[in-house]
Amino acid sequence: MKKLVFIFCCILSIDSYAAHSCDRLAQIADKHGVMYGTKYSFTVIGKKGFRSYFHSAPSEQCKLKNTFIIPNDSVIAYQDFKHENQDWMYVMYIDKNGNDTSGWVKAKDFKVSGRMSPN
């Protein structure tokens, strides 16, 4: 029984550490990322069944497992940040009901689809 409690405590502390590191990385990315403003819209590229997942910070470890968008969905990108040899974008997606979702996504999953403002 003691072993089970110990294992459970270890799992909880790993989860807590991952959440803390994602929060810290999100702060670093926010401070040091390249800001787009609201100039560009991007569209998810990929074949049917592809999912581009949102992340709470620009890292694979910070993936939000049930939050994703699919090909042809459009987002507004606000910021760019390079981490883990990968380009990430901080974006907002607005669904057909007007609900918005924001987070970090892999830039390679998108193409520029338009310009939001003249500057």
List where the protein language model places each region:
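SH3-family beta-barrel domains
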Residues: 19-58, 67-71, 80-81, 111-119
